[in-house]
Swiss-Prot record:
It is an enzyme of class 3 (hydrolase). The lineage of its organism: Eukaryota, Fungi, Dikarya, Ascomycota, Pezizomycotina. Pfam families: FSH1 (PF03959). Belongs to the AB hydrolase 3 family. The active site is at S93, D183, H243. Disruption phenotype: Impairs the production of fusaric acid. Induction: Expression is positively regulated by the secondary metabolism regulator LAE1. This is Hydrolase FUB4. One of its GO terms (biological process) is secondary metabolic process. Pathway: Mycotoxin biosynthesis. Its EC number is 3.1.-.-. The keyword Hydrolase applies. Keywords: Hydrolase. GO terms for molecular function: hydrolase activity.
Length: 267
């Protein structure tokens, strides 16, 4: 098995390798893991404690400006095309979001061709942003509050209804982020919406493993990525930690069992 591994926001290949070592020690020794550096410089506006994060580090993108997300996606897709084939993709945090985006885009653009991966593994992953759902244009009012305007894309997720974009699950995360740093941004800003499981016409038919911590401090790390996938082909577990890999031996063993069961199901 050969896996493409994607790190999270303000992470590095080296840090992800270190975090994966306890779990890969429980997997077959002849499996291969290839790591891709994200490439964009993180910003303190997204991560206030960035100065304490070990360097080097990088992100796939910062705020979901359409051009930045598209650049990250195209770079990843080009890498898979040139360096593949890979048997699986394994994404942590924002890397998991990018892995899900890659599969969703394949489903949308090449529905009648084989997926680029036989399986996918997600650790502490969250929903990716969509190129099809349009953008929210956020602007500041005279009262220094954020006002959203929805510009639909190929898909109108509002279905003609007036939605509270400050609370809607497509956009609430981004609202909270930019509202916290609105005095340091230039407005207006146009940001992509996130995919929701209800947005896709059918579940992704790729065997998958989903792992998250019960103490994850990011509320948006939930079951949503799991819900994008065919439940008959998906396996999931939780562990006692937070926004990281399982650390207790019995949890690592269970994680490894889920991965191996998924690999066996491919044959």
């Amino acid at each position: 098995m050969r896996f493409l591994c994607l790190h999270g926001y303000a992470f590095s290949v080296e840090v992800l390798q270190q975090q994966m070592e306890p779990i890969t020690a429980h997997l077959p020794s002849d499996w291969e893991y290839e790591f891709l550096e994200a490439g964009m410089e993180p910003t303190q506006l997204m991560l206030p404690n960035l100065k304490q994060v070990p360097k080097p580090n990088s992100s796939w993108y910062n705020f979901p400006y359409p051009e930045d997300v598209e650049e990250a996606y195209e770079r990843l897709a080009a890498y898979v095309e040139s360096e593949g084939p890979f048997d699986g993709i394994w994404g942590f945090s924002q890397g998991g979001s990018m892995a899900a985006l890659l599969l969703l885009m394949h489903q949308a653009e090449h529905p009648d061709t084989p997926y680029p991966f036989k399986m996918a593994i997600f650790t502490s992953a969250f929903l990716p942003h969509s190129f099809d759902n349009g953008v929210i244009s956020w602007d500041l009012t005279e009262k220094n509050t954020l006002e959203p305007a929805y510009l639909p894309g190929r898909i109108d997720v509002s279905h003609g209804k007036k939605l509270d974009w400050k609370k809607d699950l497509h956009t609430s995360i981004e609202y909270d982020m930019i509202n916290a740093v609105k005095d340091e941004l230039d407005f207006p800003v146009d940001l992509l919406l996130r995919w929701r499981p209800s947005d896709i016409p059918e579940k992704i038919p790729v065997p998958s493993v989903h792992v998250r911590g019960l103490k994850d401090h990011y509320s948006f790390v939930d079951e949503s990525v799991y819900e994008l996938f065919d439940p008959d082909m998906a396996r999931k577990m939780t562990h006692r930690g937070g926004h990281n890999f399982p650390r207790y031996n019995e949890e690592l063993v269970h994680f490894a069992e889920l991965i191996i069961e998924t690999v066996v199901s491919l044959h």
